[in-house]
Amino acid sequence: MSSPAPSTSHNAANSTQAFSLKTRRPIDEDDLLTAEDREAKSTVEKLDCATRRRACKNCTCGRAELERQLEAGGSQVMGAMPPGGCGNCAKGDAFRCAGCPYLGMPAFDNAVDGKVKLDLTDDI
């Protein structure tokens, strides 16, 4: 007599699996955080006017003079490099240094005094 064929039940196959959707437990989100993650992060504020909209009381970067000139009705002209300038003032905020007096202003062209170049050529 021959021996019976081995049984291929699904329960036997599932018991050897490392992962099963039926036995999966939900992960507690609080267990994923460490004690360091739970601590409140504090940002250190600079004490200069690069992070503010107005010049600080003891401004040394030239922003106070620039604001006084604009309030008096003068126009903002970039003649020479600002003090401590990196040369990227005209490129926009992404390229400006923290002490740039032009922080928050749109990009401009050093050679042109506030004039917009229009391309009047036809696209056809």
Swiss-Prot record:
Coiled coil: none
Disordered: region residues: 1-39, 40-124
Keywords for this protein: 2Fe-2S, 4Fe-4S, Cytoplasm, Iron, Iron-sulfur, Metal-binding, Mitochondrion
Motif placement: Cx2C motif 2: 97-100
Positions occupied by motif Cx2C motif 1: 86-89
Region (Fe-S binding site B): 86-100
Binding residue positions for [4Fe-4S] cluster: C86, C89, C97, C100
Cofactor: [2Fe-2S] cluster; [4Fe-4S] cluster
Keyword Protein transport recorded: no
GO cellular component, one term: mitochondrial intermembrane space
Protein localization: Cytoplasm; Mitochondrion intermembrane space
Residues the entry annotates as binding [2Fe-2S] cluster: C49, C56, C59, C61
InterPro entries assigned to the protein according to its UniProt record, in alphabetical order: Anamorsin, CIAPIN1
Main location: cytoplasm
Subunit structure: Monomer.
Protein's job: Component of the cytosolic iron-sulfur (Fe-S) protein assembly (CIA) machinery. Required for the maturation of extramitochondrial Fe-S proteins. Part of an electron transfer chain functioning in an early step of cytosolic Fe-S biogenesis, facilitating the de novo assembly of a [4Fe-4S] cluster on the cytosolic Fe-S scaffold complex. Electrons are transferred from NADPH via a FAD- and FMN-containing diflavin oxidoreductase.
Description of its domains: The C-terminal domain binds 2 Fe-S clusters but is otherwise mostly in an intrinsically disordered conformation. The twin Cx2C motifs are involved in the recognition by the mitochondrial MIA40-ERV1 disulfide relay system. The formation of 2 disulfide bonds in the Cx2C motifs through dithiol/disulfide exchange reactions effectively traps the protein in the mitochondrial intermembrane space.
Protein family according to the UniProt entry: Belongs to the anamorsin family.
Protein's name according to its UniProt entry: Anamorsin homolog
Natural source organism: Trypanosoma brucei brucei (strain 927/4 GUTat10.1)
Lineage: Eukaryota, Discoba, Euglenozoa, Kinetoplastea, Metakinetoplastina
